[in-house]
Design a protein with these regions (language model features):
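Glycine/Thr-rich phosphate-binding loops that ligate phosphate moieties of nucleotide
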Residues: 1-140
Length: 140
């Protein structure tokens, strides 16, 4: 759902809003993990979207934690290789396999200057998500 747009907004605004909404989903997932007592100290990003410095900065700013991109953008292949390394006994555990195969390519730190604007945006996202949740569950 696009909310609050006017005729003065451009394609660029819409594109950025998509990146921000996906960043809010990441934040919601991190908040859910925190509710279970799991602290997320950094985000690891891979796949095609990780090539975008702008999007990486948005996610880091929204979540206010560092984001790291890794040397592989082929997430499925990397995951399969990690699992295969563990399954065949090459590595003792998944952490050892991952540490062997994954190298951080770039680290993006959150811009604290964007904290308030994204906190406000996240609260609006949560409110709209809650208000529209039942609408999404209905079929037309």
């Amino acid at each position: 759902v696009w909310f609050g747009f006017t005729l003065q907004h451009t394609r660029a605004h819409f594109m950025r809003s998509v990146m921000e909404s996906l960043g809010y989903i990441v934040k919601r997932n991190i908040d859910s993990l925190a509710d279970m007592g799991i602290e997320v100290k950094e985000i690891r990003s891979l796949g095609g979207g990780s090539k975008s410095d702008v999007w990486n900065q948005i996610k880091s700013d929204i979540c206010q934690i560092p984001l790291e991109t890794v040397n592989s953008i082929e997430a499925a292949s990397l995951g399969a290789a990690i699992l295969a390394g563990k399954a065949t006994g090459i590595f003792k555990n998944l952490n050892e396999a991952a540490e062997s195969m994954v190298q951080v390519k770039k680290r993006t730190l959150p811009n604290t200057g964007n904290k308030t604007v994204y906190e406000d945006g996240y609260e609006m996202y949560r409110k709209l998500f809650g208000d529209l949740d039942q609408c999404f569950k209905k079929s037309i």
